[in-house]
Structures are given as structure tokens and as C-alpha cells.
């Protein structure tokens, strides 16, 4: 069964950082979702901080729509992995998830 990379976009706002209670609530929602995915979760992953996009022209800030984090899951097909991503509770709040099959090396 192939591994798939979930790349989370959104959630990088210029609002004040969340309170510890807000962070816990968000983490509880995410962990509940991972719990529903069960053994298909290979790596929960981690959130990311704002970064830079590097090209021949130089480096520029990624901005609020940059990568917000990643996870790795197992699925039988890209379609199944996409359906798993669609079930994420933050999709309703505007988060986007790009899904990529990870090629074995």
C-alpha cells in the first residue's frame, strides 16, 4: 500500500497567537481525526512556521497561504487518500490539503 503526503495550506494568519486553551482545542480536533484514520497514519507530521520560496530570482516570504504542516498516510489509491483528506475537520474552515503519492526509492 503506497504512502501519501498530505501538505496542509492555510491557517497562517496575522492574528495574535492562539491561547493555550485554543491550541488544546485545535490539537484535540486534529488528534480525533488522526484517531479515526487509525493505522493508515504513518506519520502524524508537524506544523510549520512561515518560510521562504527559493528560485533563480531569489528568495521570498511564503506568506499566509504557505505550507502550514504535513502528514503521511497509507492508502490503496490516490482517490482513497483524497477521500481521507476530505474528511479533515478544518476543510470547512478553509484549510486546503494537497495530496501526493510518495514514490519508493
Predicted regions mapped to residue ranges:
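Conserved, structured core segments of small domains
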Residues: 1-105
Amino acid at each position: 500500500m503506497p504512502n501519501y503526503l498530505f501538505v496542509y495550506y492555510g491557517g497562517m494568519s496575522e492574528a495574535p497567537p492562539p491561547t493555550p486553551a485554543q491550541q488544546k482545542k485545535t490539537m484535540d480536533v486534529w488528534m480525533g481525526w488522526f484517531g479515526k484514520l487509525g493505522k493508515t497514519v504513518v506519520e502524524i507530521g508537524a506544523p510549520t512556521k512561515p518560510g521562504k520560496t527559493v528560485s533563480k530570482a531569489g528568495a521570498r516570504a511564503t506568506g499566509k497561504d504557505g505550507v502550514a504542516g504535513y502528514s503521511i498516510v497509507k492508502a490503496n489509491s490516490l482517490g482513497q487518500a483524497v477521500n481521507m483528506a476530505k474528511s479533515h475537520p478544518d476543510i470547512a474552515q478553509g484549510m486546503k490539503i494537497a495530496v501526493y503519492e510518495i514514490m519508493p526509492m
